[in-house]
Amino acid sequence: MVQKKKFCPRLLDYLVIVGARHPSSDSVAQTPELLRRYPLEDHTEFPLPPDVVFFCQPEGCLSVRQRRMSLRDDTSFVFTLTDKDTGVTRYGICVNFYRSFQKRISKEKGEGGAGSRGKEGTHATCASEEGGTESSESGSSLQPLSADSTPDVNQSPRGKRRAKAGSRSRNSTLTSLCVLSHYPFFSTFRECLYTLKRLVDCCSERLLGKKLGIPRGVQRDTMWRIFTGSLLVEEKSSALLHDLREIEAWIYRLLRSPVPVSGQKRVDIEVLPQELQPALTFALPDPSRFTLVDFPLHLPLELLGVDACLQVLTCILLEHKVVLQSRDYNALSMSVMAFVAMIYPLEYMFPVIPLLPTCMASAEQLLLAPTPYIIGVPASFFLYKLDFKMPDDVWLVDLDSNRVIAPTNAEVLPILPEPESLELKKHLKQALASMSLNTQPILNLEKFHEGQEIPLLLGRPSNDLQSTPSTEFNPLIYGNDVDSVDVATRVAMVRFFNSANVLQGFQMHTRTLRLFPRPVVAFQAGSFLASRPRQTPFAEKLARTQAVEYFGEWILNPTNYAFQRIHNNMFDPALIGDKPKWYAHQLQPIHYRVYDSNSQLAEALSVPPERDSDSEPTDDSGSDSMDYDDSSSSYSSLGDFVSEMMKCDINGDTPNVDPLTHAALGDASEVEIDELQNQKEAEEPGPDSENSQENPPLRSSSSTTASSSPSTVIHGANSEPADSTEMDDKAAVGVSKPLPSVPPSIGKSNVDRRQAEIGEGSVRRRIYDNPYFEPQYGFPPEEDEDEQGESYTPRFSQHVSGNRAQKLLRPNSLRLASDSDAESDSRASSPNSTVSNTSTEGFGGIMSFASSLYRNHSTSFSLSNLTLPTKGAREKATPFPSLKVFGLNTLMEIVTEAGPGSGEGNRRALVDQKSSVIKHSPTVKREPPSPQGRSSNSSENQQFLKEVVHSVLDGQGVGWLNMKKVRRLLESEQLRVFVLSKLNRMVQSEDDARQDIIPDVEISRKVYKGMLDLLKCTVLSLEQSYAHAGLGGMASIFGLLEIAQTHYYSKEPDKRKRSPTESVNTPVGKDPGLAGRGDPKAMAQLRVPQLGPRAPSATGKGPKELDTRSLKEENFIASIELWNKHQEVKKQKALEKQRPEVIKPVFDLGETEEKKSQISADSGVSLTSSSQRTDQDSVIGVSPAVMIRSSSQDSEVSTVVSNSSGETLGADSDLSSNAGDGPGGEGSVHLASSRGTLSDSEIETNSATSTIFGKAHSLKPSIKEKLAGSPIRTSEDVSQRVYLYEGLLGRDKGSMWDQLEDAAMETFSISKERSTLWDQMQFWEDAFLDAVMLEREGMGMDQGPQEMIDRYLSLGEHDRKRLEDDEDRLLATLLHNLISYMLLMKVNKNDIRKKVRRLMGKSHIGLVYSQQINEVLDQLANLNGRDLSIWSSGSRHMKKQTFVVHAGTDTNGDIFFMEVCDDCVVLRSNIGTVYERWWYEKLINMTYCPKTKVLCLWRRNGSETQLNKFYTKKCRELYYCVKDSMERAAARQQSIKPGPELGGEFPVQDLKTGEGGLLQVTLEGINLKFMHNQVFIELNHIKKCNTVRGVFVLEEFVPEIKEVVSHKYKTPMAHEICYSVLCLFSYVAAVHSSEEDLRTPPRPVSS
């Protein structure tokens, strides 16, 4: 999940004993019962599930004849229990064995039948065992079921005991020891259970072994009968009872074991004396390694073979239902968990049940679930459930016969893509084959892992362990042990998922919609599939699965980073392996003793029992189900056994447990168990995320509180008492911070290092590291790199500086080539798209780019595009690369050249560029040019387009000769954004960009023609992008439509002068019909017009000049009078249909809207008079004065947004497209509509005005009122305006010259008709998702999502709500603008409703904003074209300033860019990467010195207060800039943040006198209260305060002696005191700002 799994403070939750309290020799199976449980009380969050008894004994409590005990008498397996509400998984580790019970009357009946069935039942339950205590569950030895199958006594460790047991004639009953835990330490938990069994056995032998005439096995089982409650304790000796109490004390101490901390602490638990058994190590890997898989992951590969295994994996990945069955519980559950683990980094999103008990009532109903699942069932399951019919969509995998059985109605599984599948099979087969390689003289690999002595290795010198032959070795494999094979298997799977035809480049096709309260990510499957080099059905189906969809969310804040290391060609198990042997030596040890050295059990354990340890495996890898012949899966004998089970009448319902029946012999409170005083602190991750991330790892052992109990000892290697508290504090807060990865050079020394740590006196020495080959070459091999390069990520260099975590030296930039043209200028037209690599290990990219993207690094850097992890993320050693791109009005407009060939010309060209939304890789792979060539081409392309834009703005047009090249270049999304940002005259000034509504912009007729040509070229390029599934991004459509809606030219000013009532500069309020309606403020605005931006002065026109036509153009216009009349007939007919309802004049608001200033913001009054007739009016006819409101709200960030109304003029095809928009062809009336505007209050209060509005218009004010009450447009005579969007719809044919010119331009495929692109709903969705990403980047919402999420979780409820509201507003703004644009381009309104509602649901917008959008959709039938105003984007209102600073107090320090944002101060490196981010809530104090030009910032860093000094020439400006920004941030919050109150009281000890007392921080100063005296230090006498190793140092200026006196107080709250004093200084400085000259604040320093 995205959220980290909840920490569990218990290593073990429960230890239970399951069996039959009164076993019966007559029946094969009985209902299992809970015989004993520890502890007796349920845990609050996890009560003991009653049905655990069925999971321990899935086929019931079996009874068998003793002669069948020639089979192994104890087995182990694993099951899981998943909470259906929380989804939390607990693991059950179970050891099953048979204990004897004596028959009072010998019964021969059924010996042939029942005994035979018992034989089968024995195997069904017991024929598997997990071996390998340290590294894997691979010790299971499955004996064949044939009658003549007898184990090889010479090879079996239990041979002697089995041989002796063969002739005994007693019955035995199945008994289970089970541990339930949140942690998957399968092998070590199993070892604990075997040790418990050994303790009980040894006690029995010691106490009763000297009695003659009693078989030794009966003695041992007598102890078990007492232990399980079958015999009364009073019947036995007190010595026996004493031993049992000691055993229970051992169990209670085991249950109190401390918990290891991932990447920080390991727990070494002594379950037996050191001379008998080495301590068991419990350790969890840090997030940069694979998650712990404590079982043989390769087991399914062995059982099924590689091909069948991949077939099952395909079923799982494509969300089919899969059921596995086997007689071997262990192989069954391990295989299920292995399949789930093998799909990493994907996560299986549906139910997983490794073992579903046969005897549990109604268990078969789970197989009827409609969702996919993976369930493992015993082989007897379907035979026992007679009435159950298997669903016909379930794939059945028989592990015993190695078959995959397809369901009856199964669809054909798509084959895995080539060549990836061939590569995967090769790697998997190599991994399996490596176990049989004779590269090292190891007789028994599993024993080697268990730490046993290996005779052939004992005589060899230690350095020979690392000397390996160089032949017959694959680069993927670093050893022939099962653990390395498992790592190699997982690496092969990760590499498969990261291949070009599977999921490579995945994150480039995701769009983050929101981060709070939980991440929501949209996956653009269409563009993703289009980017695959080879289209395959497998990739198509995989892209539609929930696992891939969730992967996009998980990858924002991943809980594990091993896949990133693998992408970066790290395959060494020492670096990414999950087993403790590879990293335990790096962790701080916590020693915990379960065994009491004073216990009398030592006497029993001192004599080894007459058998080898039950825990020893007999084979070297996994379950040897591979040894089965075909008869092992014959169900004839199994069917007989199941029929016997059915006769036994097992009660499979959840039992009602009587607590008294399984009460412990002793009380847990009587057990001497030391409470680990600091354990909870050491275990639980610190609540402060920064705290837990930024503290250094504890590589060396630190001292912890020593145990006071002789039975439990906790100690560390470091015994220095002075630092113990501080070290513990660091350990407590550094939980989630992983250790830096081990350099490859450490690999060879691991063996010796671990051997040095292991005591020489150990009977069984644990060797943590198997000798493995040094990774001297990467993967893929060097010689194959060229041909395989397309599929793999680049290797980025790593640099280690001192003791700090490794930091990445970032590549200059990874730029994407345009995917639509093969020419070099088009290929290199993505100059500013950069890959942000947050890796400290040098990772290339998440599911990284194809080689065509990474072979050549760009030489350009945009600081706004680059992000590095904050210090916490870097120290966390959790690299997470992501692609950061920004659009218009981005975070910083600083662009620097960082590579070869960077010249001044290139730099200047790049400065003007805004980067784009491009995240997609090209479909066509081609050899990219060199970095220098790409930079040169990119700069040339930008310069060319800049010249074209300037030519257009100068009125000279695009030029026919340039048209083809312009079209080709605009196929790059980056260059589209670049051109549109230059064309948009609305965003040229800072003030204009921050207006709530986007005013219209007047341009000349010549500029209009040139801009229209450019916009049409852009539309054509967007059509090309959409044809390629949106590769490259399409957010530029928002910018295009904003320009099309706001830019216009005015026609025939000379004709307008003839209009009797035309008064361009006359305020509307002066009209007699509107007298008294304009308020004074509005009238003032009208008298002082605020003109909108105009075309550049190069056009030769002043701001008030209007464009005029030449006489030749007038002649052309006169020559098409007949055409005008033809259009007039159509318009008149359409208008008459709607006239009875409401009459709407022609065009929308226009230029005089700006000339009359922002009327809409205040009065909103505007009138279009019927007498204001112009050319257009003569075509349409007379219209009465009409006033109409249009809404407006925020618009979009880096994308430009437009809002226009009006349908196509005189185009029959366009009229027909409105058929479904409203009754009676309502849309057609807008062909003759003119737009006026009133404020809501005026409409409500003025009766004369309200009567003008028809039925439809009475609804519109209510919409505008609720749509954030935004200002509305002003109205005037806009009939003379021609907007650019009309040209996009084919409506601007004003002259024959225009038609001739358009006909000529069609040579270049610039269509004069409406594009069909506007009717593609997928286009609008993709454009919206791209625009959201662009806006989020512009707002800084996606810079380091991990840090953003951590900060959100650390904030109070009010601040969380504010962040959620910011994201809601962003999404609602873009959705609103999307509706506006779709209306503008005449999209079918039903389609608009469906698409917007779907996007609204996908975005998870909050109730307030979703209600506003829904109201717009409800009134959609009454809205057309420009009725819906544009909401201004949030990024346009952001104000960011950047300062160049030097770290330290002079210019010798490193150069950084300090960026002052709304919520934080961002410190960027000289190449633009984010180095630090300081949220304002973490800043405590800030001062500056104008003389030294040094700015001092104090901030809260975890539990410490940290001082940072920066030198800058603009020190004063920077100080006030930060101060103003912090004040604005504080004003937004409207509530006090949760945190420490001002002042406080702290316990201290005076180091001079040793006296203890209280230190009080007050507004007046510091008050010190001791037993015999009291001291008060005034605030203005405090010169300095700091902390040194838990000591608070205070320097006081004493006026009487005119000296500075130092006070030192020892306190565990030194940092809190320093923080409180600093807060006090800040408060006093703010309150008494006018007295700053008289009272100089101190300059405290925190060490």
Curated annotation (Swiss-Prot):
Residues 128-141, 700-712, 827-840 have a biased composition (Low complexity). Residues 289-429 form the cDENN domain. Transmembrane segments: none annotated. GO terms for cellular component: axon; cytoplasm; cytosol; membrane; plasma membrane. Residues 142-157, 689-699, 790-804, 932-941, 1158-1173, 1189-1207, 1234-1243 have a biased composition (Polar residues). Changing G305V: In DEEAH; impaired TNFA-induced activation of the MAP kinases ERK1/2; enhanced susceptibility to TNFA-induced apoptosis; decreased EGF internalization. Its main location: membrane. Residues 108-122, 750-768 have a biased composition (Basic and acidic residues). PROSITE patterns: DENN. Residues 158-167 have a biased composition (Basic residues). The keyword Transmembrane does not apply. Changing P354L: In NEDDISH; impaired TNFA-induced activation of the MAP kinases ERK1/2; enhanced susceptibility to TNFA-induced apoptosis; decreased EGF internalization. The modification Phosphothreonine is found at T1061, T1066, T1237. It comes from the Eukaryota. The modification Phosphoserine is found at residues 156, 689, 692, 813, 818, 820, 858, 862, 916, 921, 930, 1059, 1110, 1239, 1270. The keyword Cell membrane applies. It is found in: Cell membrane; Cytoplasm; Cell projection, Axon. Residues 14-268 form the uDENN domain. Disulfide bonds: none annotated. Changing W1318R: In NEDDISH; uncertain significance. Keywords: Apoptosis, Cell membrane, Cell projection, Cytoplasm, Guanine-nucleotide releasing factor, Intellectual disability, Membrane, Phosphoprotein. Interacts (via death domain) with TNFRSF1A (via death domain). Interacts with PIDD1. Interacts with YWHAZ. Interacts (via death domain) with KIF1B; links the motor KIF1B to Rab3-carrying vesicles in anterograde synaptic vesicle transport. Interacts with KIF1A. Interacts (via uDENN domain) with RAB3A, RAB3B, RAB3C and RAB3D; the GTP-bound form of the Rab proteins is preferred for interaction. It is linked to DEEAH syndrome: An autosomal recessive disorder characterized by moderate to severe global developmental delay, impaired intellectual development, poor or absent speech, and endocrine, pancreatic exocrine and autonomic dysfunction, as well as hematologic abnormalities. Additional features include facial dysmorphism, seizures, undescended testes, and distal skeletal anomalies. Death in early childhood may occur. Overexpression of MADD activates the mitogen-activated protein (MAP) kinase extracellular signal-regulated kinase (ERK). Expression of the MADD death domain stimulates both the ERK and c-JUN N-terminal kinase MAP kinases and induces the phosphorylation of cytosolic phospholipase A2. This is MAP kinase-activating death domain protein. The gene is MADD.
